Swiss-Prot record:
It is found in: Cytoplasm. Sn-glycerol 3-phosphate binds at K106, G137, S139, K192, D245, S255, R256, N257. Catalyzes the reduction of the glycolytic intermediate dihydroxyacetone phosphate (DHAP) to sn-glycerol 3-phosphate (G3P), the key precursor for phospholipid synthesis. It comes from the Bacteria. This is Glycerol-3-phosphate dehydrogenase [NAD(P)+]. InterPro entries: 6-PGluconate_DH-like_C_sf, 6PGD_dom2, G3P_DH_NAD-dep, G3P_DH_NAD-dep_C, G3P_DH_NAD-dep_N, NAD(P)-bd_dom_sf. Signal peptide: none annotated. It comes from Bacillus cytotoxicus (strain DSM 22905 / CIP 110041 / 391-98 / NVH 391-98). Belongs to the NAD-dependent glycerol-3-phosphate dehydrogenase family. The gene is gpsA.
Length: 341
């Protein structure tokens, strides 16, 4: 049994806390809303983020970060990308020994273009880090909370660390594979949110299945193109954290990025969309970060660029589609590097 604290009591953090509790671990969950923490402790429900789901009574919720981290050597971070640095800075004030840092968030920091594992390594002193591990894959919180079959990937630089996290989470409904490609796993999980927004726009405009299939396929090409340039393994993007996550996020009504895009496609403004969602839409911030990163790395990402214009330059969604369809002719298949070298 492992004592583990989940940082972030949204839908995904709560669902993962359930998986860990089902596996017999000593699970704590921290959130910054005392009333929500009280509800988890007394009613065993997170009505705001997972209404109707009964949580294991063994999950203990804290609104005090210091209390939540007492005698804990493993943490699971599940907070919005924009909150990471602030949360990490608060955490390092109250921990004293090395920890395994698992994160299950999907995003890139605008301005710095940093992946989340890089933010952890920048903010937390080296002597307080045992390992940094990423948990990612096609996984809607609503389905995990219902204990429906789900498969994800655990990625770390040190394979033993990825396997330790694999063992923490594996059970009859939650299967975990391992992958040493932490760069590819993080980028796949983050960048697919951009394509999910675009897929929602496609559906909102009523463009049909042909257009959506093309968008998803060419979107995966963009993800892999940037991922390769950043040092990711091309094969990772054909796996759970690339193609798998892209499929589930672009095709499900559970996806908040798809829902946001769908509203944009139906004519709502970005401000209206974000006000109505009630939860973070990571794809909006990730679009900005990925656009900046693609410019910096000189990587062609036309779908990302078109979505950036829609979100931040006020371009009409129909005009954005027209500009993509009217691009100069291209070859479909790009050269794949020899991975045996």
């Amino acid at each position: 049994m492992t004592k583990i604290t989940v940082i972030g009591a949204g839908s995904w953090g709560t669902a993962l806390a359930m998986v860990l509790a089902d596996n017999g671990h000593d699970v704590r969950i921290w959130g910054n809303r005392p009333e929500l923490m009280d509800e988890i402790n007394t009613k065993h429900e997170n009505k705001r983020y997972l209404p109707g789901i009964t949580l294991p009574s063994t999950i203990v919720a804290y609104s005090s970060l210091e209390e939540a981290l007492v005698d804990v050597s493993t943490v699971l971070l599940v907070v919005p990308t924009k909150a990471y640095r602030e949360v990490l800075q608060d955490m390092k004030k109250v921990i004293s020994g090395p920890m395994t840092w698992i994160h299950a968030s999907k995003g890139i920091e605008p301005g710095t273009s940093k992946r989340i594992s890089e933010m952890i390594e920048e903010e937390i002193p080296e002597h307080l880090i045992r390992d940094v591990v990423v948990l990612s894959g096609p996984s809607h919180a609503e389905e995990v909370a219902l204990r429906q079959a789900t498969t994800v990937t655990s990625a770390a630089k040190r394979m033993e660390a990825a396997e330790e996290v694999q063992d923490l989470f594996m059970n009859h409904y939650f299967r975990v594979y391992t992958n040493p490609d932490i760069i590819g796993v993080e980028l796949g999980g983050a960048l697919k949110n951009i394509i999910a927004l675009a897929a929602g726009i496609t559906d909102g405009l009523g463009l049909g299945d042909n257009a959506k299939a093309a968008l998803m396929t060419r979107g995966l090409t963009e993800i892999a193109r940037l991922g390769r340039k950043m040092g990711g393994n091309p094969l990772t993007f054909a796996g759970l954290t690339g193609m798998g996550d892209l499929i589930v996020t672009c095709t499900s009504v559970h996806s908040r990025n798809w829902r946001a895009g769908n509203m944009l496609g139906k004519g709502h403004s970005l401000e209206e969309v974000l006000d109505s969602m009630g939860m973070v839409v990571e794809g909006v911030r990730t679009t900005k970060a990925a656009y900046e990163l693609a410019e910096k790395m000189e990587v062609e990402m036309p779908i990302t660029a078109a979505l950036y214009d829609v979100l931040f330059n006020g371009k009409n969604v129909k005009d954005a589609v027209g500009s993509l369809m009217g691009r100069v002719r291209k070859h479909e298949v790009e050269a794949i590097p020899d991975l045996s070298r």
